[in-house]
Swiss-Prot record:
<dbReference type="GO" id="GO:0019062">
    <property type="term" value="P:virion attachment to host cell"/>
</dbReference>
<keyword id="KW-0261">Viral envelope protein</keyword>
<dbReference type="Pfam" id="PF00509">
    <property type="entry name" value="Hemagglutinin"/>
</dbReference>
<dbReference type="GO" id="GO:0019064">
    <property type="term" value="P:fusion of virus membrane with host plasma membrane"/>
</dbReference>
<feature type="disulfide bond" description="Interchain (between HA1 and HA2 chains)">
    <location>
        <begin position="22"/>
        <end position="475"/>
    </location>
</feature>
<dbReference type="GO" id="GO:0075512">
    <property type="term" value="P:clathrin-dependent endocytosis of virus by host cell"/>
</dbReference>
<dbReference type="InterPro" id="IPR008980">
    <property type="entry name" value="Capsid_hemagglutn"/>
</dbReference>
<keyword id="KW-0348">Hemagglutinin</keyword>
<feature type="signal peptide">
    <location>
        <begin position="1"/>
        <end position="18"/>
    </location>
</feature>
<dbReference type="GO" id="GO:0055036">
    <property type="term" value="C:virion membrane"/>
</dbReference>
<keyword id="KW-1160">Virus entry into host cell</keyword>
<comment type="similarity">
    <text>Belongs to the influenza viruses hemagglutinin family.</text>
</comment>
<keyword id="KW-1164">Virus endocytosis by host</keyword>
<feature type="lipid moiety-binding region" description="S-palmitoyl cysteine; by host">
    <location>
        <position position="556"/>
    </location>
</feature>
<keyword id="KW-1167">Clathrin- and caveolin-independent endocytosis of virus by host</keyword>
<feature type="site" description="Cleavage; by host">
    <location>
        <begin position="338"/>
        <end position="339"/>
    </location>
</feature>
<feature type="lipid moiety-binding region" description="S-palmitoyl cysteine; by host">
    <location>
        <position position="559"/>
    </location>
</feature>
Amino acid sequence: METKAIIAALLMVTAANADKICIGYQSTNSTETVDTLTESNVPVTHTKELLHTEHNGMLCATDLGHPLILDTCTIEGLIYGNPSCDILLGGKEWSYIVERSSAVNGMCYPGNVENLEELRSLFSSAKSYKRIQIFPDKTWNVTYSGTSRACSNSFYRSMRWLTHKSNSYPFQNAHYTNNERENILFMWGIHHPPTDTEQTDLYKNADTTTSVTTEDINRTFKPVIGPRPLVNGQQGRIDYYWSVLKPGQTLRIRSNGNLIAPWYGHVLTGESHGRILKTDLNNGNCVVQCQTEKGGLNTTLPFHNISKYAFGNCPKYVGVKSLKLPVGLRNVPAVSSRGLFGAIAGFIEGGWPGLVAGWYGFQHSNDQGVGMAADKGSTQKAIDKITSKVNNIIDKMNKQYEVIDHEFNELEARLNMINNKIDDQIQDIWAYNAELLVLLENQKTLDEHDANVNNLYNKVKRALGSNAVEDGNGCFELYHKCDDQCMETIRNGTYDRQKYQEESRLERQKIEGVKLESEGTYKILTIYSTVASSLVLAMGFAAFLFWAMSNGSCRCNICI
């Protein structure tokens, strides 16, 4: 037994005296986690947040200028000239338009605006408007000053309500040619009285017809007389219409009653963000690259989660709370009890908290002490690849959005309006694509890190060959003495295996000899213990027989 203890102690001393080099990666006290396709909340040493989550809670100017805030008016109230919106008549510029939730000044006389959403989209897409007179009052040889209690005993500033003059309403014929360089938005209406009496009181003609024509439209209207529910004190209705007169085109109108005639039109110029925000946010003294109904934001990140209705130079909307990309390694806490090396570990069980200037590296122990160094080559390649991943994600998302925007910009205004209506679906699709793309890249990144450490380990293994033995924890125990200069050659790939081959062979034989001697001793001890045990059993059995025969409990008969 003493021999066995001596041999075991010898093996321990031999192992403890061996110079050692380990391959591993950086470990930190980071609490950052990322998600991949197959795992959630994977601990990593470093992350890059790709999602912007903050805004300033204000309405701000953008690179296209300041917003147009309508206060108590709606866009259609501005366009048709609700008398309560006179403050806006002078012409305005905007980067986007803001409607308040408390806006009440829209169409004062009850009725419907045909293609209202398209009208709002058309008007808001321009950058400015200028009022231009289409038909002067002298155009009409009937009364043109009709008013309504519903419109504060006044009427729209862009249209004239024509009624009889001296009990006569002859056919009115008017035409206007657009000599401007821009399109002109013009508006008209058809009045539907609640009774036949009101029809003749206003227009004298019981049966009227109105036609409105340009090179693009040819519309004919007849009133539908009859009472409707009381709205704004009125049982009558006005159907509101609009169209665009292009440069060089001529507008022709013919009517013998019920016409709400064009008076002023709007010359629309430039392009804005084309957005209408319905919000009560305060107007701030600020400039942002991206605006939402919740507030403005400035960021260089590729994604945000503020609002899918963002516009301007905005990152892409993703409806998640966080979208992180690992720019480091899997963060496996260092093992505290690692014998010779203390709180370090190889690539199998954990990372090194002391590793600096790199992600992958080496730690060694020899007669000169313990040292640690990063493998800067493999680290730099990994960093470059991750930087490329971030840029690629941004480029991929930008290209996909640009393709869609370009396709819709080539189509007509009606399809642009449809584009706005399906914008939610487009945003949701690309938000899903963005999340999936990041999950894929995260999976690849972490798999690549594991492969990088494994490749570094195998590189050292090939270099050392039979001059070292693996300990199973990412380390190699050298069969020869290896000072710091020798360790550096292992790290930089210039290790000369032949230089240390003879020393390693002798040390290996020495260790193997101890093992052989130990095995021989174990065999002798085994045989000795087996024989000794057998003798003890035999002597015990003989003593039992002798005792039993002496007291008569056992008798032996021999028959011949």
